Amino acid sequence: MMQDWFRNAKLGIFIHYGIYAVGDVSESWSFHNGNISYEDYMKQCEGFTASKFDAKKWAELFQKAGAQYVVMTAKHHDGVALFDTGYSDLSVVKKTPAARDLVKEYTAAMREAGLKVGLYYSLIDWSD
């Protein structure tokens, strides 16, 4: 059953963010489709600093745009979690120079701005 707030929401934002923000790789489907090897894809972890990740600025922008909710990928098909997970060591917290829980920062900033928070967590995991 759809919640009333969602039915009435006019604008929502969906953020695909991950280690593929480093280079010229278009999201995690690149290695699945054979455009890049899994090993080369995962090398992006070495350069993932999240230095331009600013959840508060995003929240301000989304609020100004009139968004009522925001959904972010917490873990996409590549298996790289954007949060500190006890399930695997494959996270931006443990495997990248960023060493930050981006989901925690995102969630806090969106809620502080009065935006509803959603998370996309892929059950598909090509890292297994």
Give the predicted meaning of each segment.
Residues M1-D128:
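Mature catalytic domains of secreted/periplasmic carbohydrate-active enzymes
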